[in-house]
């Protein structure tokens, strides 16, 4: 073995590429010192990190367990089968595909499996809390399909179920989609299934945001109602970034497998599937139920305190891991709010609210989520403190204008760092 070959297999990142290590350490320090409230983000275990950084990253494994196109796939079959079986047990589903690289890939594969370009699909509109992949004009789902969007009621800001049925009867969609990225309440899956059956549609639920809450038993499961359920494997499920598709229908399972590979993707990411298996194993433990319960309780505590401090909440609160704050009464935009909060050490995202008069780059709201800080160890007492910090920053924006108040932001940042120091992340990294 040459010296160059030996160093290729032995040099750590610090020696091989210090510039990349520096950037990674910057991100590690950011995560350690900031409070993460982006609802779609979470913090994985050291075990998930280890699996995702494993030698499975070297392996191509096109196909499915027992039916690969390459040799040398026995360990890949082992890890993918483990991930599948754990997911089936976790969600009570007969068939699971763990290969989608993302939630968007999973949703795209479902549409490829059950619809043709030009078919009508129905989903919750983006400004009402839906997702790009549910028929938004800018996305593939809105360009390749005749996308009909249902909305929320202007007074309650809850899904307008009467409108859902009326639109379905009028448009006879091929696919009806429930789920979203900024809808803070439970969804009546049984109603959607009844409507889908009435018009002969395939009913798909995208549970990407609340899958971990379903796994933890604190959120109604869509799996018994949906023909097909999709999800990401991160967010509340607390695994690596990736996607997954579930169904109880063997005919649909066959179509889905073909749509994922070779329809949408080539080789699966076996190192990510290994990490998915780890995360599913973690979610099967009793402690995960306690985690999921805390996620909801913390989000509700955060929302309630913000309401006490004068914020308006879309739908008045939350049943899930996220809350949507309407900033219009404060005269503050989402863009100004998320920038000011980041300066203060709290990360969230600007977000449109139902019937938002502002464009997506500005918005009238912010979205706040509890999963990451709950993973860190925050409980109700800490979330009440966080809510007060957020309210202080928002009040300063309201009174001082879009630049905010540097003194308030500095004081909040000091409180944030003190709180973060009590709940350290990855101490051995």
From Swiss-Prot:
Its EC number is 2.1.2.1. One of its GO terms (cellular component) is cytosol. Keywords: Amino-acid biosynthesis, Cytoplasm, One-carbon metabolism, Pyridoxal phosphate, Transferase. Pathway: One-carbon metabolism; tetrahydrofolate interconversion; Amino-acid biosynthesis; glycine biosynthesis; glycine from L-serine: step 1/1. It catalyses: (6R)-5,10-methylene-5,6,7,8-tetrahydrofolate + glycine + H2O = (6S)-5,6,7,8-tetrahydrofolate + L-serine. (6S)-5,6,7,8-tetrahydrofolate binds at residues 126, 130-132. It comes from the Bacteria. The record marks 234 as: Plays an important role in substrate specificity. Its cofactor is pyridoxal 5'-phosphate. It is an enzyme of class 2 (transferase). GO terms for molecular function: glycine hydroxymethyltransferase activity; pyridoxal phosphate binding. GO terms for biological process: glycine biosynthetic process from serine; tetrahydrofolate interconversion. Gene3D superfamilies: Aspartate Aminotransferase, domain 1, Type I PLP-dependent aspartate aminotransferase-like (Major domain). It is found in: Cytoplasm. It holds the Pfam family SHMT. The keyword Amino-acid biosynthesis applies. Homodimer. Catalyzes the reversible interconversion of serine and glycine with tetrahydrofolate (THF) serving as the one-carbon carrier. This reaction serves as the major source of one-carbon groups required for the biosynthesis of purines, thymidylate, methionine, and other important biomolecules. Also exhibits THF-independent aldolase activity toward beta-hydroxyamino acids, producing glycine and aldehydes, via a retro-aldol mechanism. Belongs to the SHMT family. This is Serine hydroxymethyltransferase. It comes from Zymomonas mobilis subsp. mobilis (strain ATCC 31821 / ZM4 / CP4). The gene is glyA.
